[in-house]
């Protein structure tokens, strides 16, 4: 079968190359985070969702790998809710060309399973920890599992992870004053703490107005206290990462409302239902699943993705209050 050469790497009309696939494997989540699924997961009306199978995942990852993608992040929902999660990790890790296999998890299964996930081929781990105060953690997530999640992070280091990334969604009047506690936590731990600005989605207008706070004040603090901006790799995510000689940990800032945020976009998304999303805040996804049924469909799959890439907008339209059709971040993997 003819493969994509390096010259045929996935690229849009703005000369952005795509090294990074965010692949959702389920919409289901067992937490009730204020900024995502405050009422818990509710299946869509109509027939039950049929999420991508392992073979469909293998085919879509193979197509991306043949066209220059080197990193896959497995997302959800909560990806570890899938009973075949370990098999999915292994399948992706065995794909020629894939160098990094990451996942983002709420951490509730970490302590028990992170060892087997690492053995399956997981190379990077992100855990959502929106507060270091157990009561605030429970208020934000709807689950009293703070100690369980923290034990999972400790276990990740025990089984050999050299760094764990911790995601914190910044929310005014909830956790935005915890910076000193977070800084103390990463002083002696190799944790990359990633502060993520609250993003507006279709179902969260009121929450956004009440709790959005910019990451600029944190960046100003970092620059004023000896932190240095770290260079980005081709397949890194959108975070601006800062390092300090006195800290084992790092700090990342993800600020989607900042000017030129989209200029360095290097990632595409495939939903758990097999739809290609050119942007987290774009319109309806592009159907890929009909081309994931047989290995011999790969050329057609690649051609469809490459064609649709030429429709990728130069930037999102969040500043206009347009968050696309994304109802909440669990729907296409955040």
From Swiss-Prot:
It catalyses: GTP + AH2 + S-adenosyl-L-methionine = (8S)-3',8-cyclo-7,8-dihydroguanosine 5'-triphosphate + 5'-deoxyadenosine + L-methionine + A + H(+). Residues 13-239 form the Radical SAM core domain. Keywords: 4Fe-4S, GTP-binding, Iron, Iron-sulfur, Lyase, Metal-binding, Molybdenum cofactor biosynthesis, Nucleotide-binding, S-adenosyl-L-methionine. GTP binds at residues 22, 73, 104, 165, 267-269. GO terms for biological process: Mo-molybdopterin cofactor biosynthetic process. [4Fe-4S] cluster 2 binds at residues 262, 265, 279. [4Fe-4S] cluster 1 binds at residues 29, 33, 36. Pathway: Cofactor biosynthesis; molybdopterin biosynthesis. The keyword Metal-binding applies. It is an enzyme of class 4 (lyase). Its EC number is 4.1.99.22. Binds 2 [4Fe-4S] clusters. Binds 1 [4Fe-4S] cluster coordinated with 3 cysteines and an exchangeable S-adenosyl-L-methionine and 1 [4Fe-4S] cluster coordinated with 3 cysteines and the GTP-derived substrate. Monomer and homodimer. Belongs to the radical SAM superfamily. MoaA family. NCBIfam families: moaA. PANTHER family: GTP 3',8-CYCLASE, MOLYBDOPTERIN COFACTOR SYNTHESIS PROTEIN A. This is GTP 3',8-cyclase. It comes from Vibrio cholerae serotype O1 (strain ATCC 39315 / El Tor Inaba N16961). The lineage of its organism: Bacteria, Pseudomonadati, Pseudomonadota, Gammaproteobacteria, Vibrionales. The gene is moaA.
């Amino acid at each position: 079968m003819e493969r994509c050469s390096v010259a045929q790497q996935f690229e849009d009309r703005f000369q952005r190359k795509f090294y990074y696939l965010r692949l959702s494997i389920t919409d289901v989540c067992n937490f009730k985070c204020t900024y995502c699924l405050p009422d818990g997961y509710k299946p869509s009306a109509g027939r039950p969702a049929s999420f991508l199978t392992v073979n469909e995942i293998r085919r879509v990852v193979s197509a991306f790998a043949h066209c220059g993608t080197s990193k896959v992040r497995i997302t959800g929902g909560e990806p570890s809710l899938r009973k075949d999660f370990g098999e999915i990790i292994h399948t992706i890790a065995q794909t020629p060309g894939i160098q990094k296999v990451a996942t983002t998890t709420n951490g509730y299964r970490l302590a028990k399973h992170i060892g087997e996930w690492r053995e399956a081929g997981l190379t990077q781990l992100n855990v959502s920890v929106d507060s270091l105060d157990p009561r605030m953690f429970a208020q934000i997530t709807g689950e009293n599992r703070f100690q369980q999640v923290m034990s999972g992070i400790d276990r990740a280091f025990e089984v050999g992870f050299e760094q764990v990334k911790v995601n914190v969604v910044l929310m005014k009047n909830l956790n935005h004053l915890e910076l000193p506690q977070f800084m103390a936590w990463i002083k002696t731990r190799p944790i990359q703490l990633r502060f993520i600005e609250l993003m507006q989605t279709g179902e969260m207008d009121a929450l956004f107005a009440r709790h959005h706070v910019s990451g600029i004040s944190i960046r100003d603090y970092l620059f004023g206290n000896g932190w240095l901006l770290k260079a980005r790799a081709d397949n890194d995510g959108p975070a601006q990462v800062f390092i300090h000689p006195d800290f084992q940990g790092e700090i990342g800032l993800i600020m989607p409302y900042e000017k030129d945020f989209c200029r360095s976009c290097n990632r595409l998304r495939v939903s758990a239902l097999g739809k290609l999303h050119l942007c987290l805040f774009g319109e309806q996804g592009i159907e890929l699943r009909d081309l994931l049924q047989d290995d011999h469909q790969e050329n057609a799959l690649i051609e469809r993705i490459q064609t649709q890439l030429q429709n990728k907008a130069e930037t999102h339209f969040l500043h206009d209050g347009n968050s696309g059709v994304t109802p909440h971040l669990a729907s296409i993997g955040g």
